[in-house]
Amino acid sequence: MAKKRVYELAKELNTTSKRLMEKLEEINIVVKNHMSFLEEDELEALYDHIGVIRHKDDKSNTDDNKTASAHSVAQHSSEAMKELKKEAKKAPRIIRTTEIYLDSKDEEIKEIKANDAKSQKKPEEKRKKNDFVRVETETSGLRPGLVRETKPEYMRILEEQKKSEASKAQTNEKKDAEKNSVKEVVKKEEGSKQTAEIKDGSVNMEGKVLEEVKATVADSATNVNLNESIDKDKKTNDNRQVSTDNSAVNNEENAADTLNKKDMDKKNNNKKNEAKKNAEKKNEAKKNEKNDNKGGNAKKNEHRSPDMKKNDSNRPQDANKQNSKAAADKNREEGRTGSKKSLEIPKVELTTSQKEEFNSQRAERREYNKDAEKDSKRELRKEQPRSAISGGRNKNHKVIKNVFNSRKGVSEVLSDDFEMDDFYFGGSKKSRKIKKKKEEKKEEKPAPPKPVVTSIKIAAPITVKELAEALKKTSAEVIKKLMSLGIMATLNQELDFDTAAIVADEFGVKAEEEVVVNEEDILFDDSDDPNDPEAVPRPPVVVVMGHVDHGKTSLLDAIKKTNVTEKEAGGITQHIGAYMVKINNRNITFLDTPGHEAFTAMRARGAQVTDIAVLVVAADDGVMPQTIEAINHAKAANVTIIVAINKIDKPTANPEKVKQELTEYGLIPEEWGGDTIFVEVSAKKGVNIDYLLEMILLAADMLELKANPNKQAKGTVIEAKLDKDKGPVATVLVQRGTLCVGDSIIVGTTTGRIRAMTDDKGHRIKKAGPSTPVEILGLHEVPEAGETFYVITDEKTAKQLIEKRKLKQREQLLKASARVTLDDLFNQIKEGKVKELNIIVKADVQGSVEALKQSLEKLSNDEVRVKIIHGGVGSVTETDVTLAQVSNAIIIGFNVRPPANVIDAAKKAGVDLRLYTIIYNAIEDIEAAMKGMLEPTYKEVVIGHVEIRQIFKVSGVGTVGGGYVTDGKITRNANIRLVRDGIVVHEGKLGSLKRFKDDVREVAEGYECGLSIEKFNDIKEGDVVEVYVMEEVKE
């Protein structure tokens, strides 16, 4: 195979070069243009791809293969079949319905052209255009030796069937022609004989029946012989003899017709005689019909000819059509062929005399109708509304095509009454009277009274939805009632018992509070009986409150005569301390709450567990904001307040001014007619300390403080922390009962068994009575400060309660998490784009964590919002660093020292880790960080002016102005304004700044320079360039 160019190959294949190049690209063969050569392997690949089949000139080989394959097919040997399969794989297969031959001058193709030219019109014109294209033939694409059948097997079968049907039709036509010829001959020969017999009147009704039976037998025999004679084309004389018998029957019919005409004339003349003989003829007709039905039908069916059987198929089979034509013709024939007396047959009402022909389906239907009537009669006996419907049925029943014209219940549809009445008998077409009776019966039934709610039991709190369900009202009705009462409530809003009782009363329902027994009621005994005979006096719990640096801890130090203040960092109390002081053989428990505003929550908890509050006010400072807050907390907790005016030893002290200021807040001294005890003390010098203690004991006696030490122990957690060696440690104040080592307690969401107890002086104790502060060990987790603890005995119920509390706490955390909800979306829109400062707080005790949280959250402003994403007790861990890295937060450690690996991890992650021992420093640093996050405020500062005196145009640079610095200085990359005649022409930046040929950073006043402006060339002599910078304004 020689090389070929693309355009040459395109001509041979009768296509375009572009199309060929596209086909070559499909098989990854790239050619430059239509003049490129194609190698032999490329041609082979292209032929295989586009379906071109090349045939060789060796015909002998193909002939040998054909003969060999044909011989192998004839033998059907296994070895030959294997060889055929191998050859079939190698043989060329047709890819398209048109084969393309490149060797168009071969003799074989010429022969094919000659053969095709005979069958096609104008073959010369088509072959001149493309001689190499040949249409698919019988042998194309097949194995050698095999020929494709032009007509499949099923086509042959269809043609054979058509041929056989055509031959049958021809034979039938011959039969009919021969029959007609035979009948005409027989009619002429036998016509006279038949008429003579009829005139004599010797044939009676019974003889007629016998003759008809003989005639049917003879007719069937003649048909059989006639078919044989037509098939064999012999014995024509015999066929004529047999056909005479067949024609006799037809001749009798014609004679009967002529006789019928004569009889009709006689009937018209003798009508009077007919009326007399009606009764006798009726009886004869009945007898004949009975004989016909009993014996005649069976014999006729057995000996009927094929033509008669064909006619039977067209007869109506419905027995209900009693006046059918077949029955009437039958009666006429019986009358015509009888005796003279019986020939005068009157018109008989066949509808009453003739019986129904037997039919098995009709008999079943008749039995079914009888059963239905019996069922209806049974239903009439029952006292049911359906009985009236079944009794009014119509006997002419019809099946209803569409039964979906009325609604029925499932029980009614599945009942037998529906199937009988509605489906078969047309239950939808009931009489109006029945419907009226049914409606009257329905109206007679009394409607059941609606349940009226008179009283309900509800548990407080209850949601609006639950209240509506209890009242059997809709939620909308309950909400409307609440709105009329001035309460705007939603569907899931909780209502207290009093509000729910008022709403129920508005609906005329009496509400009773349901007693709900939960795990807390089982575990805890919260009943406090003031007249308990086992109650004994207990020490008072005193809390010292006041402003920062007013001397609270110094007063406690003076009372305890121990130096506590020096131990605190910066001299400020950081934790709640609980101490017991013995005065005159009586104990007093002191709680020292920090005075800083950050510890508001801690101070609120301290006020809740105390009996007396000592308000410390400095004589020189007077009432401060934290002092007012302390007064409010004490009043909210209903605590007796004793005012201690401290620092009276100072020369600037003014106790009277302090008393005057406190009267504004409801604290009036006794000497001024009030009920508040005022004591002037000096904690530093110990002045009037004993008198203050006596006043505390006096107030305690007035309160008559008692507690039952034998009850279930109950108390409050004052402080809790996580100790490295001891684990979770909690400082608790026992308020009731006696706490012992080994008791199991439950605090919030944690439990534990007390392993050890120590008092305020560090001594190990085994029991702690009411109003005793102790430090306990053995809890599983660090509890929250302010939680109430109980001693429990049923640990199983306690675990269930803890699971409930944890679930509730988890729900609250999910609600508090910053997720976008429909309720919170409006608030976020109002806030706009708010920057957040994420902070992680770690402290040594829980109280400090809460104090830092509240202090830092108060620093939030309109542009920056402080968000405490995590707060916990203990040192900073690597987990905290990871959380800070992910959430872009800073870590604040208070009184904790992180290990070296945590500090390294924070440095690698770029997390800001800050450690503090005094809370003021932490707050100040956070404020500075927040100011850094605010968008800075800039102001414009003019640093100099340049007067343009000469202009130079430099290729590649543009216009350069030579100027003189009149004042200030000019710096590179500074902002400039080009002023021309007092009008700002352009604002931009300096592109370059030079002095002579050197680039300089700045040019001072009194020097010349050359400058260019970025993206601006319209500089003219006399312009003034104003140079300025933007400086940040510190807040």
Curated annotation (Swiss-Prot):
Localization, UniProt: Cytoplasm
UniProt-annotated stretches for the region G2: 571-575
Main location: cytoplasm
Region spans: G4: 646-649
Keywords (A to Z) from UniProt: Cytoplasm, GTP-binding, Initiation factor, Nucleotide-binding, Protein biosynthesis
Region (Disordered): 56-80, 114-402
Binding sites annotated in the UniProt record for GTP: 546-553, 592-596, 646-649
Composition-biased stretches (Basic and acidic residues): 56-66, 114-137, 146-200, 229-238, 259-315, 327-347, 354-385
Entry protein name: Translation initiation factor IF-2
Species this chain originates from: Acetivibrio thermocellus (strain ATCC 27405 / DSM 1237 / JCM 9322 / NBRC 103400 / NCIMB 10682 / NRRL B-4536 / VPI 7372) (Clostridium thermocellum)
